[in-house]
């Protein structure tokens, strides 16, 4: 087993959110395209990601045919400037629910 094949950065190129687990097509760093990659989300939270979002892809046992995505993020839309301990739920249109040091703020 090659350890460098266990954990990889990937870019989402297509997705299907109609299943119980979202199915992704990702391009792993180095150009390898993986189909039918399951995206595991935390219980109680979900979002419909855009192609171009970035993922941390794990290949079980180093086998890229057994790849799953455990974290998907999209730096194009992520708010910045939060203070330590603050939390923000956000979307691609700039709407936010912001748990700030001054209280809860809803924008948009």
Identify the meaning behind each predicted range.
Residues 103-108:
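Intrinsic low-complexity, repeat-rich intrinsically disordered segments enriched
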Residues 1-99:
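Exposed beta-strand/loop interface patches that mediate assembly or binding
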């Amino acid at each position: 087993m090659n350890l460098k094949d266990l954990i990889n950065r990937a870019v989402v190129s297509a997705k299907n959110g109609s299943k119980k687990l979202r199915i992704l097509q990702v391009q792993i760093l180095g150009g390898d395209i993986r189909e039918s990659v399951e995206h595991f989300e935390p219980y109680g939270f979900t979002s419909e990601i855009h192609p171009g979002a970035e993922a941390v892809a794990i290949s079980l046992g180093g086998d890229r045919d057994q790849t799953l995505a455990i974290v998907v993020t999209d730096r194009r839309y992520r708010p910045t400037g939060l203070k330590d301990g603050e939390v923000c739920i956000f979307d691609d249109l700039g709407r936010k629910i912001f748990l700030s040091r001054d209280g809860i703020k809803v924008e948009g």
